């Protein structure tokens, strides 16, 4: 009865716990078996989301699997701890180290690397069967058991399973929360801890280091069957709550049964009621523990008590059960003997029963066989009715003594505290010990371990770096194919490195081929081929594709199914021919035919990546046309490389690695952006790079420096350069990229303000934006104004900023007093110079009329108590309806707002007009602000494609007048050819070119390349016009000072007029790289950056130098000893007056031109330019054409020439019909002579004639040489006389000519160059003596060369000359032979008519004529009489009437013939008659102008002679002999002997200063087309 009543208690307690364990075990088995099976080879089991489970090695690691693992995942290592209990196999492992157990943090699948690996092989020791149980505690993410190598064939049982004696172990796992663990989990964990510590020893420490549960003491028998009975929430030791160690101490003491104190145990649970109804009885008991060492110590009180139960009356059918029980007596049994009878939670209750009771039973045997014990007796109360009760106890106890001495068993003392961990880092050991009190009187020794050991792990060891190491290779997997060729592989894992060690090197997987046997291969369809082309491109067609059957092989089955299939295609409507864009070759790319609405794509150029897109669209008439291609997806290689480098740095920053090289990336991007962007995709790429840089700055990866901040802002400025305008327009096609720019700058201000600790104020001024950053505390903050005092701007556009921003100090208040004391605010203000033109807000009627200003405050305030004040200066005049707008991406579309505003909104800002040029905006939020204005009806800001009418009129009038002047000069160039004329024509060309470029520049503002070229050339021609004015002044100065001598001066004029402007422009373009040449509004130098000084500076210098030269020329004109030549003085005065008038007018013209070009809205500047430009053209024509006397005379002569040509008086012609051309000199002489054709020539004196064409004054040093040297004689004429003409010497004295009536001197031109005429006869000696005696006289003699038109001169028949002068017109030439008949009293000796050998001095002619035959003996010489005295009577030109066809030997000169065409005699007669009454006084006025002509022609002839020297083969051929009937004077060419009057030994003559020296012609290699006729046309004998 007593055992039956006590049994239900423990069963009721254990039933729920056993049920829970059973369910969890089955759940774990089901989860584990879901992923594995006997047939799988690669078996992996992952357990997660479970808190308790069980598995066996045979289920998880099947025998035929090559590599298996079991993994338990911790839900959260910070909140849960994993515990494992392993029941080892009874026999040791056949393969040691086959199964490994470890924990790790994570596993990288790509590299097969375990991170944070910690092995538990040392803790579990699965192959050590000496400890049947092993426990471990894991705190990382994963706990894994993995079989490293498969079992060998000898290890497998008969069914291929693990033998139970080797590797058949079982595992229980438990997941316990670190805080407030569950009661059931703590019960199981405490049992595990108890078993772990019970079996722990030095060789096998306990693997459970600590528990979150408060384990309580209780009866611990078999850990697997004896549940712990909780006694409270904590474990007590000496009255203090402790941990699991205290609980384990109590458990051990209770298990030994030797308590230190006696007394009653707690009451057991109430037993079963004796009756179902009508009142029954329940009882409960308790146990008395005797006090050790106290003799006779017992417990006072009853051992058992009862109470009534089921008091309900029984019904008619009710039954009452009556059972009898005997009361238990108190004994001294040990606790273990009571077993499950020991109950708890009992409460005393009065016994009830019948008044009559039975008698006491006999006393029981003494409870102790030795020493003091207890005896008990009991009685029963017999109930007779329900109203009576038994009085008194039902059981009694008494002490009893036994004479035998009781044995005292050994007892354990308290456990010592746990020792310190044996290792300060890594895995170590802790232990504790206890002392056993020795047994006495044959007692039993102490049971249980004397020492307990467990693992400990305080911290990770920070030792040296540990490199990652590979685990062993797994075995080769089963061949992937059961037959034919297959693959096998094996893998290995890497234990991750620690403390910065190196990664595992090598591959984690290896593969190899395997072949088992040939397999029968069925036929298998290959993949479908791609669909073929549609049968029609539109209107409905079909496509076909097919597949190929591979096989069958080795007896396999054939392929099943169709081999090809069809589908419909091309259902769209066919486009009409006019709806297709034709193939086009545009931008060096061939664009194929594309239907309208589609986009064609081609690869970007080689220097970029991506695609060029071009859309085909329909116009309003439905005709397809190509749109311009877009390069929005093209990114240059340099920008792409920078973008990839930045992304790599950002990836490192996100992983927390140290950063290096960020500053170099920013510097490289700055250098690339300064060179400009090639494509619109470069802009988007740069924004992406800057965005990534901002993210890098935000992290601890890299701290930006002030240089990085400056480079960052400069890069943004480079993006906003004018040359990127068209690329920004393309970039807007992919979305509003302006908001990305605003967001980028805002994030940059935030990052820089808070990442740079030493930052207070920062100003960054660039060409296109100004950035201001202020960092200030909230406490004591004042109003912030932009720009601040002490503005340090360097750019021209930002030196005097017209836009202002005021941020009230109320913005810097957070509303919390504590926060305001420590808060720091960053205020960023950005002023964009030209961003408004990139935002596509400019329309036909509206325009962004201000710069764009962005204001940022970090951290952003909740609201603005005081509005933000922004003052804008208007950019355009003539606008109305100024409206403040702000950038608001969150603002929805408003019905009242125009659709073109986009994210711009006018809500939140109030407009306050200040004046006509300024507007104030009061805004209640922080954003980006600007002003939108309405254009007036007559104004539009669109780019005009044609210049204004005013500019066209001004440039046209000026250019036409100057062009007319150039045409006039060209038409009369042979009359007015001079250096001054050359300078004037160059000056006019520079002005005409400037006017044309001004008009072209007005139409090319959108074409960047053309506009830049126009600006550069306009700069060049503006400067050249100033330089040519300076050149004219310089020429005048050199003329008045007499230094205008050589052709080198002319080259200097060209260098000054064209070279100096070209040098200035080249230097400007080189230094600026063409930046500043052209802007978005005009094709001229930018007004900012200082490039305009490249024009203003040189122009001002030219004006200053011109003034200085003008002053010097003026002083020369007004001084007494200044210019004596009246003509030169007049020219110098005209040049000075021209400079004084033209130069100021030129400066005003170009100044107004610059203003008109740069400000196209101003009509005043355009009108001023038109007036000044037109006036300049008229003034230049007036000064240099209408008022210039030379031009007037030249025009008159030109008109006369045209009239004469119309009348047929052409001045002679060749025999073959070609017109004979006059030289410039002949024409000028003819011009000067025509005005006096019918005058009396009697007044013309010999001195006048000879002094007209005298040689220009020589330099002083040459004059001195001539004065010291011997007087010139006829014996040594200048060599160039025979080559070109007879040119008078200024040093020849002209005395009265002697009367030689019977002698004549005939000079004929020979083809050989540099002929010398040498005479030693008496007549020449006489002439020499006469000339030397008359040297002191002032008259100069000259050789006069008459023009070609002298054939029309009319002779004066009435003139009777004193001297017999015969003028013989030579046939074929215009050479006039003047001969004087000698008197009879003046005998002369005629030299033989033969040519001296050599024909000339050896150093002169380059080609020697053929050797002549032996000459005849010379005739006897006659003495020369003294010459008669010549009176200074004016000679007259007489006409002999017929030419001297056969000059006799008395001619006195060796004549040479020329093989040229014969001139008509009638033409010569007409010219003679025309010059009969010539007034040679008029010829003197043209002498100065013709001096240079003579020099140039002389150089030409000299150069031709040198050419003949260089090519001897061409001139050494003998001339073809002509028949006598064609040439009357052929006999003159017959060779003769050397005459007696020619000196046989010629001494070398010193070069005469009168001889014109040869100067290299402009092009040395050019062939000068001069024939004999051209040379002879210039010679005339006087």
Curated annotation (Swiss-Prot):
Disruption phenotype: Viable and fertile with normal brain anatomy but mutants display severe deficits in hippocampus-dependent spatial learning and memory that are accompanied by enhanced long-term potentiation, impaired long-term depression, a thinning of the postsynaptic density at hippocampal synapses, reduced protein levels of Dlg4 and increased Dlg4 polyubiquitination. Smaller myofibers than wild-type animals and impaired muscle regeneration after injury. Impaired bacterial clearance following E.coli infection. The modification Phosphothreonine is found at residue 609. Glycans are attached at residues 64, 401, 607, 692, 844, 877, 881. Residues 313-335, 1382-1549 are annotated as: Disordered. Its main location: membrane. The TSP type-1 repeats in the extracellular domain mediate binding to phosphatidylserine. They are also required for bacterial recognition and binding to bacterial outer membrane lipopolysaccharide. This is Adhesion G protein-coupled receptor B1. It comes from Mus musculus.
């Amino acid at each position: 009865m007593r055992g039956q009543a006590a049994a239900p208690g423990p069963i009721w307690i254990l039933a729920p716990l056993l049920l829970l364990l059973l369910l969890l075990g089955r759940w774990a088995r089901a989860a584990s078996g879901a992923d594995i099976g006997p047939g799988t080879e690669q078996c992996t089991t992952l357990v997660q989301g479970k808190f308790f489970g069980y598995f066996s090695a045979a289920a998880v690691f099947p025998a035929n699997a090559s590599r298996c693992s079991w993994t338990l995942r911790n839900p959260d290592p910070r909140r849960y701890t994993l515990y494992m209990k392993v029941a080892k196999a009874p026999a040791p492992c056949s393969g040691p180290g086959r199964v490994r157990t470890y924990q790790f943090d994570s596993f990288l699948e790509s590299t097969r690397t375990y991170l944070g690996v910690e092995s538990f092989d040392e803790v579990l020791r699965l192959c050590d069967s000496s400890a049947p149980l092993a426990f471990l505690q894991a705190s990382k993410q994963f706990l894994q058991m993995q079989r490293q190598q498969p079992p060998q064939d000898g290890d497998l049982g008969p069914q291929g399973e693990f033998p139970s004696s080797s590797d058949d172990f079982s595992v229980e796992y438990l997941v316990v929360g670190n805080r407030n663990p569950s009661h059931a989990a703590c019960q199981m964990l405490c049992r595990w801890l108890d078993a772990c510590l019970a079996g722990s020893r030095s060789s096998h420490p306990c693997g459970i280091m600590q528990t979150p549960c408060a384990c309580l003491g209780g009866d611990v028998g078999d850990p697997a069957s004896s549940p712990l009975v909780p006694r409270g929430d904590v474990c007590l030791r000496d009255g203090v709550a402790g941990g699991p160690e205290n609980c384990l101490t109590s458990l051990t003491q209770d298990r030994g049964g030797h308590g230190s104190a006696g007394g009653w145990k707690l009451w057991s649970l109430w037993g079963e009621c004796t009756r179902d109804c009508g009142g029954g009885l329940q009882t409960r008991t308790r146990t008395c523990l005797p006090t050790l060492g106290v003799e006779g110590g017992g417990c006072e009180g009853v051992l058992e008590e009862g109470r009534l139960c089921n008091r309900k009356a029984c019904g008619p059918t009710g039954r009452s059960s009556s059972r009898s029980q005997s009361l238990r007596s108190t004994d001294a049994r040990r606790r273990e003997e009571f077993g499950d009878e020991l109950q708890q939670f009992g409460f005393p209750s009065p016994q009830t029963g019948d008044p009559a009771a039975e008698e006491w039973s006999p006393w029981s045997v003494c409870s102790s066989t030795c020493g003091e014990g207890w005896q008990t007796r009991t009685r029963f109360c017999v109930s007779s009715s329900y109203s009576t009760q038994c009085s008194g106890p039902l059981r009694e106890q008494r002490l009893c003594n036994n004479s035998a001495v009781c044995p005292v068993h050994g007892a354990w003392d308290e456990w010592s505290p746990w020792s310190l961990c044996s290792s300060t880092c890594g895995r170590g050991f802790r232990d504790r010990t206890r002392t056993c009190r020795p047994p006495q009187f044959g007692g039993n020794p102490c049971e249980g371990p004397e020492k307990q050991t467990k693992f400990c792990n305080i911290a990770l060891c920070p030792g040296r770096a540990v490199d990652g190491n590979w685990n062993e290779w797994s075995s080769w997997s089963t061949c992937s194919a059961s037959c034919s060729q297959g693959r096998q592989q094996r893998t290995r894992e890497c234990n991750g490195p620690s403390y910065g060690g190196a990664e595992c090197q090598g591959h984690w997987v290896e593969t190899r081929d395997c072949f088992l046997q040939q397999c029968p291969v069925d036929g298998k369809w290959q993949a479908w081929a791609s669909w073929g082309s549609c049968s029609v491109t539109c209107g409905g067609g079909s496509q076909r594709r097919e597949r190929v059957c591979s096989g069958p092989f080795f007896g396999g089955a054939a392929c099943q199914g169709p081999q090809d299939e069809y589908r419909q295609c091309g259902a769209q409507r066919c486009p009409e021919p006019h709806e297709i864009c034709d193939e086009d070759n545009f931008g060096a790319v061939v664009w194929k035919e594309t239907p309208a609405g589609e986009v064609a794509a081609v690869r970007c150029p080689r220097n970029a990546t991506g695609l060029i897109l071009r859309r085909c669209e329909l116009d309003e008439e439905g005709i397809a046309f190509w749109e311009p291609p877009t390069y929005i997806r093209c990114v240059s290689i340099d920008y792409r490389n920078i973008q990839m480098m930045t992304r790599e740095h950002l990836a490192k920053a996100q992983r927390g690695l140290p950063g290096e090289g960020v500053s170099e990336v920013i510097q490289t991007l700055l250098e690339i952006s300064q060179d400009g962007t090639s494509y619109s995709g470069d802009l988007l790429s740069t924004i992406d790079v800057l965005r990534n840089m901002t993210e890098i700055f935000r992290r601890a990866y890299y701290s930006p420096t002030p240089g990085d901040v400056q480079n960052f802002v400069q890069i943004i400025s480079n993006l906003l350069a004018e040359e990127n305008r068209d690329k920004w327009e393309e970039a807007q096609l992919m979305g509003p990229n302006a908001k990305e720019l605003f967001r980028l700058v805002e994030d940059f201000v935030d990052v820089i303000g808070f990442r740079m600790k030493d930052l207070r104020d920062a100003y960054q001024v660039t060409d296109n934006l100004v950035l201001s950053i202020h960092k200030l505390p909230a406490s004591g903050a004042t109003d912030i104004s932009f720009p601040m005092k002490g503005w340090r701007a360097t750019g021209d556009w930002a030196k005097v900023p017209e836009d202002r921003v005021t941020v009230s100090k109320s913005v810097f208040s957070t509303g919390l007093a504590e926060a305001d004391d420590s808060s720091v605010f960053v205020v960023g203000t950005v002023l964009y110079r030209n961003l408004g033109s990139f935002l596509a807000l400019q329309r036909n009627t509206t325009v962004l009329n201000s710069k764009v200003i962005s204001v940022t405050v970090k951290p952003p305030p909740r609201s603005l108590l005081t509005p933000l004040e922004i003052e804008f200066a208007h950019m355009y005049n003539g606008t109305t309806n100024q409206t403040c707008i702000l950038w608001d991406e969150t603002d929805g579309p408003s019905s009242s707002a125009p659709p073109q505003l986009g994210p711009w909104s006018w809500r939140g800002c109030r407009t306050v007009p200040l004046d006509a040029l300024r507007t104030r905006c009061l805004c209640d939020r922080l954003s980006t602000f600007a002003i939108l204005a309405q254009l007036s009806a007559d104004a539009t800001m669109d780019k005009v494609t044609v210049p204004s009418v005013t500019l066209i009129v001004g440039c046209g009038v000026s250019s036409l007048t100057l062009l007319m002047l150039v045409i006039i000069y060209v038409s009369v160039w042979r009359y007015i050819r001079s250096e001054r004329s050359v300078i004037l024509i160059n000056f006019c060309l520079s002005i005409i070119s400037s006017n044309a470029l001004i008009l072209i520049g007005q139409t090319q503002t959108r074409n960047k390349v053309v506009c830049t070229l126009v600006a550069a050339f306009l700069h060049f021609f503006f400067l050249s016009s100033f330089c040519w004015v300076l050149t004219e002044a310089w020429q005048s100065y050199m003329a008045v000072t007499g230094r205008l001598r050589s052709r080198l001066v002319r080259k200097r004029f060209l260098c000054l007029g064209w070279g100096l402007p070209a040098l200035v422009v080249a230097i400007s373009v080189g230094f600026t790289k063409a930046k500043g040449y052209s802007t978005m509004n005009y094709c001229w130098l930018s007004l900012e950056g200082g490039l305009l000084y490249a024009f203003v500076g040189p122009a001002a210098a030219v004006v200053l130098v011109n003034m200085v030269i003008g002053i010097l020329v003026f002083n020369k004109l007004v001084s007494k000893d200044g210019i004596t030549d009246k003509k030169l003085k007049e020219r110098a005065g005209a040049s000075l007056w021209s400079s004084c008038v033209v130069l100021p007018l030129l400066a005003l013209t170009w100044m107004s031109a610059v203003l008109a070009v740069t400000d196209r809205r101003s009509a005043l500047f355009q009108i001023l330019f038109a007036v000044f430009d037109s006036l300049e053209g008229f003034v230049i024509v007036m000064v240099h054409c209408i008022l210039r006397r030379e031009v007037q005379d030249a025009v008159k002569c030109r008109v006369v020439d045209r009239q004469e040509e119309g009348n047929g008086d052409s001045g002679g012609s060749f025999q073959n019909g070609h017109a004979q051309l006059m030289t410039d000199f002949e024409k000028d002489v003819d011009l000067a002579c025509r005005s006096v054709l019918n005058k009396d020539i009697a007044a013309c004196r010999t001195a006048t004639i000879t002094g007209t064409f005298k040689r220009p004054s020589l330099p002083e040093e040459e004059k001195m040489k001539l004065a010291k040297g011997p007087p010139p004689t006829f014996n040594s004429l200048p060599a160039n006389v025979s080559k070109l003409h007879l040119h008078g010497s200024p040093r020849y004295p002209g005395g009265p000519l002697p009367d030689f009536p019977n002698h004549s001197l005939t000079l004929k031109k020979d083809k050989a160059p540099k002929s010398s005429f040498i005479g030693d006869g008496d007549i020449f000696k006489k002439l020499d003596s006469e000339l030397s005696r008359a040297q002191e006289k002032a008259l100069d003699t000259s050789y006069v060369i008459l023009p070609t038109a002298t054939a029309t001169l009319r002779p004066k028949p009435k003139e009777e000359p004193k001297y017999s002068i015969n003028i013989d017109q030579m046939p074929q030439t215009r050479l006039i032979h003047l001969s004087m008949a000698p008197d009879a009293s003046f005998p002369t000796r005629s030299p033989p008519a033969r040519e001296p050998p050599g024909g000339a001095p050896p150093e002169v002619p380059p080609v020697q004529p053929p050797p002549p035959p032996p000459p005849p003996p010379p005739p006897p010489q006659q003495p020369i009489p003294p010459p008669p005295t010549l009176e200074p009577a004016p000679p007259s030109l007489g006409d002999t009437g017929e030419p001297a066809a056969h000059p006799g030997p008395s001619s006195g000169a060796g004549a040479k013939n020329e093989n040229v065409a014969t001139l008509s005699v009638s033409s010569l007669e007409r010219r003679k008659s025309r010059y009969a009454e010539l007034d040679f006084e008029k010829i003197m006025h043209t002498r100065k102008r013709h001096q240079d002509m003579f020099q140039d022609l002389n150089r030409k002839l000299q150069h031709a002679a040198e050419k003949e020297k260089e090519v001897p083969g061409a001139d050494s051929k003998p001339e073809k002999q002509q028949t006598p009937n064609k040439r009357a004077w052929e006999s003159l060419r017959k060779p003769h002997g050397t005459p007696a009057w020619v000196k046989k030994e010629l001494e070398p003559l010193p070069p005469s200063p009168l001889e014109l020296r040869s100067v290299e012609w402009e092009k040395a290699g050019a062939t000068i087309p001069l024939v004999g006729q051209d040379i002879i046309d210039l010679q005339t004998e006087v």
